[in-house]
């Protein structure tokens, strides 16, 4: 079976990672002790992708928990599913990274990274045929961003032919912990562009807006934001965990979704949006779900898809529904909004259906879009970065850990290049080649 090794780094990474394991354990009928109590063969069919079967029929997550301070991991350990993880897979330091990317990437994190890689190796060796890695982390702090990207490049060195997938939480002033988030995020994106195959951009700005506007929560907590994240992560991994044809492994997903290697930043979406602990009073129809999931308000990245064009899209419908209706509705969306899909990639929208819906819903749909509008997110961070970097504000915290200003300049220009690449493909048309030909003839 094709296994995935999951790594969660830093406070945010460990919190959303822990929620992810709660949600998928529930979907696969696995209780907090790792015992199976399910009711469907589908739950066990591909259980080995994320779980190792230990002695006595216990299922243990292929998860590695990493942090530079013990706090968050202690709370994961004492949380609802804390006992399901392998005790040896908790790797933590004592110093903390103090929201400083340089500490996570070059100093504190670099000291801990080898002990993490030992655990990674151990997990990889127990796999029959490892397909790749997934990392949950944030880009705004010190450990998840700095040490997370360090882990990615080290794993990349050791397993160059395995897929590297990240769930990266992008910082926003609306839910901000630190003033240096734009620095940490820019330095991280600089790494992600080069070293990952697929990155789901989970944007705190969008999560906050969904909680505030759609779910009418006046003061959203991290718990509320993480509820949305776990629903989304459960949705985008459905194809990997349950039997099906489309995007059934990380590599197939990458082949379908990434037309150019640097443009691998996906915009996730989810419908129906519900708040924690609420029940759904009416089942939505397939047309309603389809219409909702393409709506900017349902995107987990604060970008308006109507400001760009989709290069590729994958949608995962969950629950009992007619395949025919799903296909009709998806075609309908494409026909009505054809200008928002690039015409030079035909059939760039793919759909999968899984019979098992998420807990508490009859039907749900998860959306993965590779849209050029994601440049809005990078522009937002870039503007905040430039405002501080122009005055060299807070730089001494980074140079004090041995970093050079040059590295900031490089990261900044790499992110600006990424924005221009998205813009270039947004403006590209199928007919362009011929135009160039004609112009050349006229000049001649």
Curated annotation (Swiss-Prot):
Modified residues (Omega-N-methylarginine): 318
GO biological process terms held by the UniProt record: cell division; cytoskeleton-dependent intracellular transport; microtubule cytoskeleton organization; microtubule-based process; mitotic cell cycle; natural killer cell mediated cytotoxicity; odontoblast differentiation; regulation of synapse organization
Residues modified to Phosphothreonine: 55, 285, 290
Originating species: Homo sapiens
One GO cellular component term: microtubule
PROSITE patterns: TUBULIN, TUBULIN_B_AUTOREG
Swiss-Prot/TrEMBL cofactor(s): Mg(2+)
Residues annotated with 5-glutamyl glycine modification: 438-439, 441-443
N6-succinyllysine modification, residue list: 58
SUPFAM superfamilies: Tubulin C-terminal domain-like, Tubulin nucleotide-binding domain-like
Induction, as annotated: Autoregulated by feedback control of mRNA degradation. In excess of soluble tubulin, nascent beta-tubulin chain binds TTC5/STRAP cofactor through the MREI motif which triggers cotranslation degradation of tubulin mRNA.
Gene3D superfamilies xrefs: Helix hairpin bin, Tubulin/FtsZ, C-terminal domain, Tubulin/FtsZ, GTPase domain
Motif MREI motif mapped to chain: 1-4
The protein, known as: Tubulin beta chain
This protein's encoding gene: TUBB
Known tissue expression: Ubiquitously expressed with highest levels in spleen, thymus and immature brain.
Sequence positions bearing 5-glutamyl polyglutamate: 434, 438-439, 441
